[in-house]
Protein backbone atom coordinates (compact mmCIF):
# COMPACT_ATOMS: atom_id res chain seq x y z
CA UNK A 1 0.00 0.00 0.00
CA UNK A 2 1.41 3.37 -1.03
CA UNK A 3 0.84 6.18 1.44
CA UNK A 4 -0.43 9.42 -0.02
CA UNK A 5 2.19 12.16 0.30
CA UNK A 6 1.09 15.36 1.98
CA UNK A 7 0.92 18.33 -0.37
CA UNK A 8 2.96 21.48 0.35
CA UNK A 9 1.09 24.27 2.07
CA UNK A 10 0.50 27.45 0.09
CA UNK A 11 1.42 30.53 2.13
CA UNK A 12 0.39 34.15 1.61
CA UNK A 13 1.56 37.40 3.18
CA UNK A 14 -1.62 39.39 2.75
CA UNK A 15 -1.72 43.14 2.42
CA UNK A 16 0.91 45.13 4.35
CA UNK A 17 -0.32 47.35 7.16
CA UNK A 18 -0.69 50.90 5.94
CA UNK A 19 -2.12 54.06 7.46
CA UNK A 20 -4.38 55.70 4.93
CA UNK A 21 -5.87 59.15 4.88
CA UNK A 22 -8.00 61.07 2.43
CA UNK A 23 -8.96 59.14 -0.73
CA UNK A 24 -6.59 56.29 0.12
CA UNK A 25 -3.53 58.53 0.25
CA UNK A 26 -0.93 58.24 2.96
CA UNK A 27 -1.22 60.27 6.13
CA UNK A 28 1.73 62.42 5.07
CA UNK A 29 0.07 63.26 1.75
CA UNK A 30 -3.18 64.01 3.57
CA UNK A 31 -1.39 66.46 5.87
CA UNK A 32 0.15 68.19 2.83
CA UNK A 33 -3.29 68.54 1.22
CA UNK A 34 -4.74 69.92 4.45
CA UNK A 35 -1.95 72.47 4.77
CA UNK A 36 -2.37 73.44 1.13
CA UNK A 37 -6.11 73.87 1.56
CA UNK A 38 -5.54 76.02 4.65
CA UNK A 39 -3.02 78.17 2.78
CA UNK A 40 -5.47 78.48 -0.12
CA UNK A 41 -8.22 79.79 2.19
CA UNK A 42 -5.78 82.17 3.86
CA UNK A 43 -4.69 83.63 0.52
CA UNK A 44 -8.34 84.03 -0.49
CA UNK A 45 -9.17 85.93 2.70
CA UNK A 46 -6.18 88.19 2.14
CA UNK A 47 -7.39 89.05 -1.34
CA UNK A 48 -4.57 87.17 -3.05
CA UNK A 49 -6.75 84.76 -4.99
CA UNK A 50 -4.50 84.90 -8.04
CA UNK A 51 -1.54 83.58 -6.04
CA UNK A 52 -3.76 80.99 -4.41
CA UNK A 53 -4.63 79.48 -7.80
CA UNK A 54 -1.25 79.93 -9.51
CA UNK A 55 1.13 79.11 -6.64
CA UNK A 56 -0.52 77.36 -3.70
CA UNK A 57 -2.62 74.81 -5.58
CA UNK A 58 0.13 73.72 -8.07
CA UNK A 59 2.70 73.54 -5.29
CA UNK A 60 0.36 71.47 -3.10
CA UNK A 61 -0.38 68.97 -5.83
CA UNK A 62 3.29 68.77 -6.81
CA UNK A 63 4.39 67.98 -3.24
CA UNK A 64 1.56 65.45 -2.89
CA UNK A 65 2.63 63.71 -6.09
CA UNK A 66 6.27 63.58 -4.99
CA UNK A 67 5.23 61.97 -1.71
CA UNK A 68 2.65 59.56 -3.17
CA UNK A 69 4.14 58.30 -6.44
CA UNK A 70 6.26 55.21 -5.76
CA UNK A 71 8.88 53.68 -8.03
CA UNK A 72 10.35 50.26 -7.16
CA UNK A 73 9.07 50.44 -3.61
CA UNK A 74 10.16 54.00 -2.79
CA UNK A 75 8.50 57.37 -3.21
CA UNK A 76 10.00 60.17 -5.26
CA UNK A 77 10.59 62.11 -2.04
CA UNK A 78 12.71 59.26 -0.69
CA UNK A 79 14.79 59.21 -3.87
CA UNK A 80 15.35 62.96 -3.59
CA UNK A 81 16.38 62.56 0.04
CA UNK A 82 18.83 59.76 -0.83
CA UNK A 83 20.37 61.79 -3.64
CA UNK A 84 20.77 64.80 -1.35
CA UNK A 85 22.37 62.69 1.38
CA UNK A 86 24.77 61.14 -1.14
CA UNK A 87 25.69 64.60 -2.44
CA UNK A 88 26.41 65.88 1.07
CA UNK A 89 28.44 62.79 1.90
CA UNK A 90 30.59 63.17 -1.20
CA UNK A 91 31.02 66.92 -0.84
CA UNK A 92 32.42 66.50 2.66
CA UNK A 93 34.48 63.40 1.83
CA UNK A 94 32.48 61.26 4.24
CA UNK A 95 32.07 58.51 1.63
CA UNK A 96 35.70 57.49 2.27
CA UNK A 97 36.38 55.86 5.63
CA UNK A 98 39.92 55.48 6.97
CA UNK A 99 40.60 54.10 10.45
CA UNK A 100 43.68 53.33 12.49
CA UNK A 101 46.38 55.31 14.24
CA UNK A 102 46.72 58.05 11.60
CA UNK A 103 43.00 58.54 11.09
CA UNK A 104 40.46 60.92 12.61
CA UNK A 105 38.75 58.09 14.47
CA UNK A 106 38.96 58.81 18.23
CA UNK A 107 41.72 56.82 19.87
CA UNK A 108 43.03 55.56 16.54
CA UNK A 109 40.62 52.62 16.68
CA UNK A 110 39.07 50.75 13.77
CA UNK A 111 35.45 51.26 14.61
CA UNK A 112 32.59 50.10 12.47
CA UNK A 113 31.50 52.78 10.00
CA UNK A 114 28.19 54.58 10.05
CA UNK A 115 25.75 54.43 12.94
CA UNK A 116 27.50 51.37 14.36
CA UNK A 117 30.46 53.54 15.35
CA UNK A 118 28.59 54.73 18.44
CA UNK A 119 27.69 51.23 19.63
CA UNK A 120 29.42 49.28 22.37
CA UNK A 121 29.30 45.72 23.65
CA UNK A 122 28.27 44.40 27.04
CA UNK A 123 29.00 40.83 28.10
CA UNK A 124 26.63 38.85 30.28
CA UNK A 125 25.69 35.28 31.19
CA UNK A 126 22.30 33.69 30.73
CA UNK A 127 20.50 31.51 33.26
CA UNK A 128 22.31 28.44 31.88
CA UNK A 129 25.73 29.98 32.47
CA UNK A 130 26.49 30.65 28.81
CA UNK A 131 28.23 33.85 27.79
CA UNK A 132 26.37 36.23 25.52
CA UNK A 133 27.11 39.66 24.13
CA UNK A 134 24.73 42.58 23.73
CA UNK A 135 25.44 45.35 21.24
CA UNK A 136 24.27 48.50 23.00
CA UNK A 137 23.09 51.65 21.26
CA UNK A 138 22.73 54.14 24.10
CA UNK A 139 21.14 57.05 22.17
CA UNK A 140 18.35 54.76 20.95
CA UNK A 141 18.21 52.74 24.20
CA UNK A 142 18.40 49.48 22.25
CA UNK A 143 20.31 46.27 22.95
CA UNK A 144 20.86 43.62 20.28
CA UNK A 145 21.56 39.98 21.10
CA UNK A 146 22.95 37.62 18.46
CA UNK A 147 22.14 33.91 18.38
CA UNK A 148 24.52 31.67 16.44
CA UNK A 149 22.52 29.30 14.24
CA UNK A 150 23.25 25.86 12.80
CA UNK A 151 20.67 25.01 10.16
CA UNK A 152 19.28 21.48 9.86
CA UNK A 153 16.61 22.18 7.26
CA UNK A 154 18.48 20.51 4.38
CA UNK A 155 18.33 17.07 5.96
CA UNK A 156 16.00 14.48 4.47
CA UNK A 157 12.48 14.93 5.81
CA UNK A 158 8.89 14.47 4.80
CA UNK A 159 6.61 17.26 3.68
CA UNK A 160 4.68 16.97 6.93
CA UNK A 161 7.87 17.59 8.92
CA UNK A 162 8.70 20.60 6.77
CA UNK A 163 5.22 22.00 7.31
CA UNK A 164 5.61 21.53 11.06
CA UNK A 165 8.98 23.32 11.06
CA UNK A 166 7.55 26.23 9.10
CA UNK A 167 4.65 26.49 11.53
CA UNK A 168 7.03 26.44 14.52
CA UNK A 169 9.12 29.22 12.94
CA UNK A 170 5.99 31.33 12.47
CA UNK A 171 4.96 30.58 16.05
CA UNK A 172 8.40 31.66 17.32
CA UNK A 173 8.13 34.98 15.49
CA UNK A 174 4.58 35.50 16.73
CA UNK A 175 5.62 34.95 20.35
CA UNK A 176 8.36 37.55 20.06
CA UNK A 177 5.98 40.05 18.50
CA UNK A 178 3.65 39.78 21.50
CA UNK A 179 6.28 40.92 24.01
CA UNK A 180 5.96 44.56 22.96
CA UNK A 181 9.58 45.56 23.57
CA UNK A 182 11.27 43.83 20.62
CA UNK A 183 12.03 46.35 17.91
CA UNK A 184 13.41 44.13 15.17
CA UNK A 185 14.49 40.60 14.29
CA UNK A 186 17.00 40.01 11.50
CA UNK A 187 18.02 36.60 10.16
CA UNK A 188 21.34 36.48 8.29
CA UNK A 189 22.47 33.49 6.22
CA UNK A 190 26.04 33.78 4.89
CA UNK A 191 28.02 31.50 2.60
CA UNK A 192 31.78 31.57 2.17
CA UNK A 193 34.49 29.28 0.76
CA UNK A 194 35.81 26.99 3.44
CA UNK A 195 39.50 27.04 4.31
CA UNK A 196 39.57 23.33 5.20
CA UNK A 197 40.78 23.91 8.75
CA UNK A 198 37.53 22.79 10.38
CA UNK A 199 37.32 19.60 8.31
CA UNK A 200 40.96 18.77 8.95
CA UNK A 201 40.47 19.25 12.67
CA UNK A 202 37.39 16.99 12.73
CA UNK A 203 39.22 14.28 10.78
CA UNK A 204 42.22 14.48 13.09
CA UNK A 205 39.94 13.94 16.09
CA UNK A 206 38.30 10.80 14.70
CA UNK A 207 41.54 9.05 13.63
CA UNK A 208 42.57 6.46 16.20
CA UNK A 209 46.11 6.47 17.50
CA UNK A 210 46.76 2.91 16.34
CA UNK A 211 45.28 3.30 12.86
CA UNK A 212 47.36 1.96 9.94
CA UNK A 213 49.38 4.54 8.07
CA UNK A 214 47.67 3.82 4.74
CA UNK A 215 44.22 4.28 6.26
CA UNK A 216 45.33 7.46 7.99
CA UNK A 217 46.70 8.87 4.73
CA UNK A 218 43.55 7.99 2.77
CA UNK A 219 41.31 9.73 5.29
CA UNK A 220 43.49 12.85 5.43
CA UNK A 221 43.71 13.09 1.64
CA UNK A 222 39.95 12.65 1.30
CA UNK A 223 39.40 15.42 3.84
CA UNK A 224 41.77 17.69 1.94
CA UNK A 225 39.95 17.06 -1.34
CA UNK A 226 36.41 17.61 -0.09
CA UNK A 227 37.33 20.72 1.91
CA UNK A 228 39.01 22.72 -0.86
CA UNK A 229 36.82 25.73 -1.66
CA UNK A 230 33.75 23.93 -0.33
CA UNK A 231 31.14 26.47 0.72
CA UNK A 232 30.37 26.86 4.39
CA UNK A 233 27.07 28.23 5.64
CA UNK A 234 26.95 30.57 8.63
CA UNK A 235 23.83 31.93 10.20
CA UNK A 236 22.78 34.15 13.05
CA UNK A 237 19.66 35.86 14.33
CA UNK A 238 19.88 39.38 15.74
CA UNK A 239 17.14 40.34 18.21
CA UNK A 240 16.91 44.04 19.11
CA UNK A 241 15.14 44.91 22.37
CA UNK A 242 14.06 48.36 23.55
CA UNK A 243 14.76 49.38 27.16
CA UNK A 244 14.22 52.39 29.37
CA UNK A 245 17.03 54.73 30.31
CA UNK A 246 17.32 53.34 33.85
CA UNK A 247 17.97 49.79 32.66
CA UNK A 248 20.60 51.06 30.25
CA UNK A 249 22.46 53.12 32.87
CA UNK A 250 22.83 50.40 35.51
CA UNK A 251 23.22 47.51 33.02
CA UNK A 252 20.25 45.72 34.55
CA UNK A 253 19.06 44.88 31.05
CA UNK A 254 21.75 42.18 30.96
CA UNK A 255 19.96 40.27 33.72
CA UNK A 256 16.68 40.56 31.84
CA UNK A 257 18.28 39.29 28.65
CA UNK A 258 19.94 36.46 30.55
CA UNK A 259 16.57 35.07 31.55
CA UNK A 260 15.04 35.37 28.08
CA UNK A 261 17.84 34.06 25.86
CA UNK A 262 17.51 30.36 26.88
CA UNK A 263 13.84 30.41 25.92
CA UNK A 264 14.55 32.06 22.59
CA UNK A 265 17.30 29.57 21.75
CA UNK A 266 15.63 26.37 22.92
CA UNK A 267 12.36 26.88 21.04
CA UNK A 268 14.20 27.40 17.75
CA UNK A 269 15.11 23.72 17.57
CA UNK A 270 11.53 22.91 16.61
CA UNK A 271 12.01 25.16 13.58
CA UNK A 272 15.07 23.21 12.41
CA UNK A 273 17.72 25.49 13.91
CA UNK A 274 20.21 24.82 16.69
CA UNK A 275 20.75 28.15 18.42
CA UNK A 276 23.32 29.25 20.99
CA UNK A 277 24.18 32.78 22.16
CA UNK A 278 27.17 34.20 20.32
CA UNK A 279 30.07 35.22 22.56
CA UNK A 280 31.88 38.53 22.30
CA UNK A 281 34.93 36.95 20.64
CA UNK A 282 32.71 35.11 18.18
CA UNK A 283 30.76 38.23 17.28
CA UNK A 284 33.85 40.40 16.77
CA UNK A 285 35.56 37.78 14.61
CA UNK A 286 32.47 37.28 12.48
CA UNK A 287 31.84 40.99 11.92
CA UNK A 288 35.50 41.70 11.17
CA UNK A 289 35.71 38.80 8.71
CA UNK A 290 32.72 40.25 6.86
CA UNK A 291 34.73 43.42 6.28
CA UNK A 292 38.09 41.68 5.87
CA UNK A 293 37.61 38.16 4.42
CA UNK A 294 41.37 37.57 4.39
CA UNK A 295 41.29 37.26 8.19
CA UNK A 296 38.96 34.22 8.20
CA UNK A 297 41.72 31.54 8.21
CA UNK A 298 43.49 33.28 11.08
CA UNK A 299 40.33 33.39 13.18
CA UNK A 300 39.64 29.72 12.43
CA UNK A 301 43.13 28.67 13.45
CA UNK A 302 42.92 30.60 16.72
CA UNK A 303 39.52 29.08 17.44
CA UNK A 304 40.80 25.54 16.81
CA UNK A 305 43.79 26.20 19.05
CA UNK A 306 41.51 27.51 21.79
CA UNK A 307 43.20 30.91 21.84
CA UNK A 308 41.35 34.22 21.91
CA UNK A 309 42.07 36.73 19.19
CA UNK A 310 42.16 39.75 21.53
CA UNK A 311 40.28 41.97 19.09
CA UNK A 312 37.81 44.35 20.69
CA UNK A 313 34.51 45.64 19.34
CA UNK A 314 36.08 49.06 18.80
CA UNK A 315 38.52 47.46 16.31
CA UNK A 316 36.08 45.23 14.42
CA UNK A 317 35.66 47.60 11.48
CA UNK A 318 37.59 47.90 8.23
CA UNK A 319 40.84 49.76 7.75
CA UNK A 320 39.70 51.47 4.55
CA UNK A 321 36.23 51.67 3.00
CA UNK A 322 34.63 53.68 0.21
CA UNK A 323 30.94 54.09 -0.53
CA UNK A 324 30.17 54.30 -4.24
CA UNK A 325 26.90 54.52 -6.14
CA UNK A 326 26.92 50.88 -7.21
CA UNK A 327 29.13 49.11 -4.69
CA UNK A 328 30.92 49.28 -1.35
CA UNK A 329 34.70 48.77 -1.31
CA UNK A 330 36.34 47.63 1.92
CA UNK A 331 39.77 46.19 2.71
CA UNK A 332 40.58 45.13 -0.84
CA UNK A 333 37.21 43.58 -1.69
CA UNK A 334 34.01 44.88 -3.21
CA UNK A 335 30.43 44.26 -2.09
CA UNK A 336 27.20 44.86 -3.98
CA UNK A 337 23.81 44.98 -2.27
CA UNK A 338 20.46 44.07 -3.76
CA UNK A 339 17.19 44.90 -2.04
CA UNK A 340 13.94 43.03 -2.49
CA UNK A 341 11.62 45.50 -4.13
CA UNK A 342 8.38 43.99 -2.88
CA UNK A 343 7.14 40.83 -1.24
CA UNK A 344 5.44 38.08 -3.28
CA UNK A 345 1.89 39.06 -4.17
CA UNK A 346 0.61 35.55 -4.80
CA UNK A 347 0.84 32.40 -2.72
CA UNK A 348 4.15 30.58 -2.33
CA UNK A 349 5.60 27.43 -0.80
CA UNK A 350 8.13 27.05 2.00
CA UNK A 351 10.99 26.62 -0.50
CA UNK A 352 10.58 30.09 -1.99
CA UNK A 353 13.91 31.45 -0.70
CA UNK A 354 15.89 28.23 -1.02
CA UNK A 355 17.56 29.12 -4.31
CA UNK A 356 18.54 32.51 -2.88
CA UNK A 357 20.05 31.16 0.34
CA UNK A 358 21.87 28.00 -0.76
CA UNK A 359 25.51 28.30 -1.93
CA UNK A 360 26.05 29.21 -5.57
CA UNK A 361 29.03 28.18 -7.70
CA UNK A 362 29.42 31.62 -9.28
CA UNK A 363 28.96 33.62 -6.07
CA UNK A 364 31.91 33.05 -3.76
CA UNK A 365 30.57 35.02 -0.82
CA UNK A 366 27.09 36.26 -0.12
CA UNK A 367 24.87 37.18 2.78
CA UNK A 368 21.08 37.16 2.77
CA UNK A 369 19.39 39.26 5.45
CA UNK A 370 15.70 38.76 6.20
CA UNK A 371 14.23 41.61 8.25
Give the residues covered by each predicted segment.
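Hydrophobic, membrane-inserted alpha-helices
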Residues: 33-43, 60-63
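Extended, folded cores of ATP/NTP-driven motor/assembly subunits in large transport
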Residues: 2-30, 51-371
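Short, hydrophobic transmembrane alpha-helix segments
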Residues: 43-49
Amino acid sequence: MIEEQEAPIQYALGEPARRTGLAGLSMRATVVLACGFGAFLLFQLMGLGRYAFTVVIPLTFAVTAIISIRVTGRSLAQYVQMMWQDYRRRSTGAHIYVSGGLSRVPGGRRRLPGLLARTETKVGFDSLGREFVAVLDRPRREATVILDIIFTGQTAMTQAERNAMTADWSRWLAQLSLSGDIEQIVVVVATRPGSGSLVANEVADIIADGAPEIARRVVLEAAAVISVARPEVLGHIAITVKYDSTSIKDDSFLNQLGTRIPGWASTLQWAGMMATPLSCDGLVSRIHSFYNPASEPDFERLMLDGVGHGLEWADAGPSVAETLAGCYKHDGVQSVTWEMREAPRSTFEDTLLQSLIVPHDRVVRKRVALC
